[in-house]
């Protein structure tokens, strides 16, 4: 462990609202310490997102960098290091040059943007079958973005919001507390949709991509600069979901209308064969296997 509690502070937020348990950085650290696996590269044990969202981080950043540098000097590894990061902007401390970053939104290797839900809130909701879904495609969320152009969510709303087969609801600006009304809007509209939009936001990924599957609906991942879907060595995304660059939004309606019931259900069935990779347990196992 890095000899400073600053690297292990609790996360002050509960976001998304369906989280009940640990964030993936927390789960990975906890499970790593319990199992002490042998890996080629050395794991840098830190809860990056937890301390980087704190208001005090900038004041302590220089001190934390010094502590991290000392830890690296005292824990040499010829093969290099690796970190596991959720934070959109990656690690805000300087890492050794030979570090692999398993990142949810940026880094070296894409990983799922997920969290632990011990209650299985979304999975336990009764699903609606293909024939009874009344909406072709929906979205409930805000128009969050960063400075990477084009702005995916703006473009998505401008292109699709007026089409009768699409139901897009702007829930307002991003807030770490999602009220019950917006939770219900997301759940009910997603359940009743054959497809649901999962555009990148500030980061390259989206929690909703993984949540949509849990509601028995197929997500549409929309990206601009880099496609950040994880584990393509093991997952065939052509069999799993719709994956488009934002320049293809004009074609999306025709793409969806040409997917029949059999193809749709095959996607959901394929999801059941790979969904363990979208869990904190499966993510831990995958990274340890890659590092072994």
Locations of regions flagged by a protein language model:
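Nucleotide-sugar donor-binding catalytic core of glycosyltransferases
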Residues: 1-210, 215, 222-245, 259-266, ...
């Amino acid at each position: 462990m890095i000899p400073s509690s600053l690297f292990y502070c609790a996360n002050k937020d509960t976001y998304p609202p369906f989280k009940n348990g640990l964030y993936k950085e927390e789960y990975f650290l906890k499970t790593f310490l319990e199992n002490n696996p042998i890996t080629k590269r050395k794991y840098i044990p830190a809860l990056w997102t937890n301390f980087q969202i704190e208001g005090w981080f900038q004041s302590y950043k220089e001190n934390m960098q010094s502590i991290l540098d000392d830890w690296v000097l005292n824990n040499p590894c010829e093969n290099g290091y690796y970190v596991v990061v959720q934070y959109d902007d990656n690690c805000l401390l300087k890492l050794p040059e030979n570090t692999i970053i398993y990142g949810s939104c940026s880094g070296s290797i894409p990983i799922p943007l997920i969290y632990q839900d011990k209650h299985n809130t979304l999975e336990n909701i009764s699903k609606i079958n293909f024939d009874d879904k009344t909406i072709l495609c929906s979205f409930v969320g805000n128009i969050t973005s960063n400075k990477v152009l084009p702005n995916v969510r703006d473009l998505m709303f401008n292109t699709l919001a007026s089409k009768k087969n699409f139901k897009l609801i702007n829930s307002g600006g991003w807030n770490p507390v999602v009220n019950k009304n917006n939770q219900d809007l997301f759940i009910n509209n997603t359940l009743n949709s054959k497809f649901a939009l999962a555009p990148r936001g500030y980061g390259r990924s989206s929690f909703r991509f993984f949540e949509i599957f849990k509601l028995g609906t197929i997500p549409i991942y929309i990206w601009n600069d880099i496609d950040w879907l994880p584990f393509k060595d093991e997952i065939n995304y052509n069999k799993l979901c719709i994956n488009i660059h934002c320049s293809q939004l004009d074609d999306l309606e025709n793409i969806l209308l040409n997917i029949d019931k059999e193809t749709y259900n095959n996607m959901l069935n394929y999801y059941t064969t790979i969904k363990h990779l979208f869990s904190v347990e499966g993510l831990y196992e995958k990274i340890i296997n890659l590092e072994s």
